[in-house]
Amino acid sequence: MRYSVIIPVYNRPDEVDELLQSLTVQHFKGFEVVVVEDGSSIPCKGVVDRYADRLNIKYFSKPNSGPGQTRNYGAERSEGEYLIILDSDV
């Protein structure tokens, strides 16, 4: 895997839905998506599951620790040589 798109998220399932939808229409497909839920009370797991057949996607949920540690958590679990970090509201 050459590229990993890491998406830290906290209580933003609608934004994650829009972001994942935009990734499905990319012509380049050589990337994985790593969504890391940072202790959300409004989870986006259902949204992520809807894209499992169209994206190479992984979902992780962890206790809230803030955006920096959440990005690092995603990076540690990614397989790409290059990391692209996109907040859910990009």
Predicted regions mapped to residue ranges:
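Conserved short acidic donor-positioning loop in nucleotide-sugar-dependent glycosyltransferases
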Residues: N11, L23, D38-S40, S65, ...
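A broad helix-preferring feature
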Residues: F60, L86-D89
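N-proximal low-complexity "stem/linker" segments adjacent to membrane-targeting elements
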Residues: M1-V25
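Local beta-strand N-terminus motif with an aromatic residue
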Residues: R2-Y3, F31, G80
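Short aromatic/hydrophobic "clamp" motif used to bind/position activated sugar donors
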Residues: L83
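Acidic donor-binding segment of Leloir-type glycosyltransferases
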Residues: L20-S61
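Glycine-rich, basic loop-to-helix element that forms the pyrophosphate-binding segment
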Residues: K62-S78
